[in-house]
Amino acid sequence: MQSIENKEKCELLCNAVCQPRCSKRLRHYEIISQCQLENDDALMNGEYCAFAANDNLQTAMMQKNFISPDDINSTYLPMGFKNFKLEGRTMAPLDFIEVLLYYLIKEEYKPMIRRYLQQIVW
């Protein structure tokens, strides 16, 4: 990673659910994009990765390519990376709330923000 030039132009995917080195990753993202554009989740049927069906933070955290907030602050920012991306378009709303809380909210505020966001979603 140190040898990458123009690190400020790179985007690092922090919570990828797709397995590392997945041979179908590009196809997975194409399908997700198409579903979003056409507002039709049925397009994923039969083509989407069975592993990614467990699309949540806990699944992502088990992957070796998972990047935690601590990793961002202690490793990637000092190396010059500045752009980090979170997956969430295919997640259930409450699962995506957990991703946002994990990455963006200080620990002491998480219970309050979680309750507030859950009320909005429900």
Residue ranges of model-derived segments:
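Active-site pocket-lining/capping segments in soluble small-molecule metabolic enzymes
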Residues: M1-W122
